[in-house]
């Protein structure tokens, strides 16, 4: 029986700066599709028609131990100003793999939590991303770039070139 690979170690880079030891947890994007049920005449049931990504599909958050001024100063920046790179070791039964999640976006919320003398002080940052890329052992599994009309799965862009070109989108 194979044991699933579990996250053993991680760090988060923000604009190239490693924040190892400062960030106890990161909530990575819950990538979700927006669908609408459609049932035409003669169909036994409804099918989910894919309408792209849900609003908030690339949202992330991080919990930061204490006050980190450079992160506070990034609040409310340009739409894709901040670059984040989550790097983690996923491990199972003597086998390690490297998992990376690259994101671009901006901080939209800073929650300093409760201030209580003598207690741990964590700040939670909400991040709205425009770019997301998930890789395992340098293999890109999923890449989404909202500003450049890219939606790749296993390296293949799923948007047809002729549609992208006709709409005047993409790079």
Curated annotation (Swiss-Prot):
Organism lineage string: Viruses, Duplodnaviria, Heunggongvirae, Uroviricota, Caudoviricetes
Gene Ontology CC terms, in alphabetical order: virus tail, tube
Subcellular location: Virion
Function, as annotated: Forms the virus tail tube.
Name assigned to this protein: Major tail tube protein
Superkingdom classification of source: Viruses
Keywords: Viral contractile tail ejection system, Viral genome ejection through host cell envelope, Viral penetration into host cytoplasm, Viral tail protein, Viral tail tube protein, Virion, Virus entry into host cell
Protein's GO biological process: symbiont genome ejection through host cell envelope, contractile tail mechanism
Main location: virion
Family matches, as InterPro entries: Tail_tube (IPR006498)
Organism of provenance: Serratia phage KSP20
